[in-house]
A protein has these predicted regions:
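A nucleotide- and high-energy phosphate-metabolite-utilizing enzyme signature
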Residues: 1-206
Length: 206
């Protein structure tokens, strides 16, 4: 508790938004849950949460820019940016709105929309993108592992399309159609990130 109150870095507190008690004596679980909520609701730390998240993402773009078009975690507008939006906004608003806190990204995004930190349309778009990124990432891990080429081999390509189809607004019939929807989702995520956390253009990468 002392470490979280005084010394924890913002990235550690962002990671703590995902923490949950999964087992243990009820009294201990309540104490741990209360300690997590207190750490995440620190009003002094909240002041720098958004600026720190922006700085971390800028550094990641320099050092870990993503490894090909199917790296839906690290690529611009990918899963990392969805999670950064949810985590940074939770930390920023939790002191006055502890009800936003949730260890599940989708739930947190919905909570943030309820207090006006995101519009309903932004939250819905981010949730849809997060589902799509996790679906694609999961099936690629099972079928190929890291993949740097634009074209996916069979049977991975068919598997990706099957998984992605119900997660897209318009089910794609081929990989170019899926790539177009992925680009639209990435653009939406990047737009919300820059509107809520700050610009990620080259001029800020100093």
């Amino acid at each position: 508790q002392r470490y979280q109150a005084d010394d924890a870095w913002s990235w550690e507190r962002m990671a703590l938004t995902r923490a949950r008690v999964v087992a243990g004596p009820p009294a201990l679980a309540r104490r741990i849950g209360a300690a997590i909520r207190a750490a995440l609701g620190n009003p002094e730390k909240a002041k720098t949460a958004i600026a720190d998240a922006l700085a971390m993402r800028l550094r990641m773009l320099r050092e870990l820019p993503g490894d090909g078009p199917w790296d839906v975690k690290l690529s611009p507008g990918g899963l990392v940016e969805v999670e950064f939006i949810a985590q940074a906004l939770q930390l920023h608003h939790a002191p006055r709105h502890p009800e936003v806190l949730a260890p599940t990204t989708r739930v947190a995004l919905g909570n943030l929309a309820k207090i006006g930190a995101l519009t309903a349309e932004e939250a819905q778009g981010l949730i849809a993108a997060e589902r799509l990124w996790r679906g694609i990432s999961g099936i690629l891990r099972l079928t190929l592992g890291p993949w740097r080429e634009d074209k996916l081999p069979e049977p991975a390509a068919s598997a990706v399309l099957r998984v992605a189809a119900p997660l897209c607004a318009s089910p794609p019939v081929d990989l170019p159609g899926l790539r177009a929807q992925m680009e639209a989702s990435a653009a939406l995520v990047r737009g919300v990130f820059e509107a809520r956390l700050g610009r990620l253009d080259q001029g800020n990468r100093t």
